[in-house]
Amino acid sequence: RLTLSMPFNKGRSAGRVGGRMTYGGVLACNLIKNLRGKSLFFYDFNAKVMHTFNEKNRLFVSTYLGDDILGVESLMTITYGNKNFTTRWNHIFNDKLTSNLSVFYTKYRYKIGVSMNPYDFSITAGIEDVSAKYDFTYLMNDNISIRYGASATFHQYGQGKLDDKTGAIAAYMDVDPSNEVKRKALEYSLYFSNNHKLGTLFSIRYGLRLSIFQNIGKETLFLFDENYNCYDQINYASGEIFNTEANLEPRLAAMYQIDEFSSIKASYLRTVQYAQVATNATGGIPFDLWFPSSPNIKPQKCDQFALGYFRNFRNNEIETSVELFYKNIHNVIDFADDAFFIGNLYVDGEVRAGKGRAYGAEFLARKNFGKLSGWISYTYSRSKRTVKDINFGEEYVSPYDRPHNVSIVLNYELTKRFDVSATWVYNTGQPVTYPYGKYTVDGVTYSIYNGERNKSRYPDYHRLDLSATLKCKDRHKNWKGEWNLSVY
């Protein structure tokens, strides 16, 4: 890991560049028996530049690049990649009104490669966005703070590009590798929110967001009957808008200050999600596909309620909180049993929609300063859904149902220049559907599923990170450095 920060241009500009890279196969895979024959690799790079034109105008430019790769020798490789480029202009109109104009580009890519005789293929999917947003903050007085703004985004969805080097998987599944499903959409929003203090003990925050989502061509839209069989198709020209969704998203939060160190908060908000992910929940190829809203797939709508109690101790040195939440979700999607999505132009017909719910409690204790600082958090949460034609129509746990989540972060300052830290995280294993049997025909093995969804789980996940940091002596005016040793 290397990070470099420095001012320049007589202090009117500043820059920061950092990067990390690791190859876990060199050390971890040789030390840990269960990881032998596997490779672990990741890197990330980030850079940020800030320039001050004058006291009312500043410009920020930042970028992030990263990849995570997990490989199983002579079998499978999974790659996640992210790219982000952002430019933000901050302008101060006066002592009450400020604005931020942002333009950014993001790209998420997910690729899985399989190399197992006679198969040698890869599937790539992802999302690419180009966005702009303009946000304003208006401080009317000491009691009223108003925020408002607008945004526009151009989405591109890649839903599974098949690269078949031997042709074996295409022949086995009877698909054409050129059948790549690409979709485009436009999304706009207008929003307004107000943080309003009603006296010294009570405050409310309310707002409203208008969101609009439009599908645009070039695209071939396939139409399905009640049995999810394709009965017709419509071809749309490049740039042609063929579907529009518009929704209002209200939100309301209230806080009551019981005394100097404790408070109660309650909130409600509605969110509309125009892009949903469907997960292949079987124990075979782990693959996720993003589906934009369309005439075939409605946007997901979620109503969330939350209630929390917050208490500080020892003059705010220690913060504690307990929060309860409940979510009611409409139009949640999942893949049907035996879904066929590789090179499938009719992939919308493999998706089923239903309703979901999530609930839980979050507990947090944080120590903010002193030689020993850090936090301990625990979250208990459940996520369940009911979807037609899945799990015999009965409720089942979603792929995101991981009931127990523990996080412990501790930092200890041994001297002014030397400190150590430890981080431990634990999560319940992700739900998965394993086959209960198999059979072989003409040398090809097929899995058998009994229709029950997500009855099993992957092993629980836990990780311990240890680090020690030694700050260099301040011998130079223009730069500061530190040495860091981390063990994951």
Explain the meaning of each model-derived region.
Residues 40-161, 319-321:
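Outer-membrane beta-barrel domain signature, strongest for Gram-negative TonB-dependent receptors
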Residues 8-14, 55-56, 95-98, 141-145, ...:
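Short loop/turn motifs that connect adjacent beta-strands in outer-membrane beta-barrel proteins
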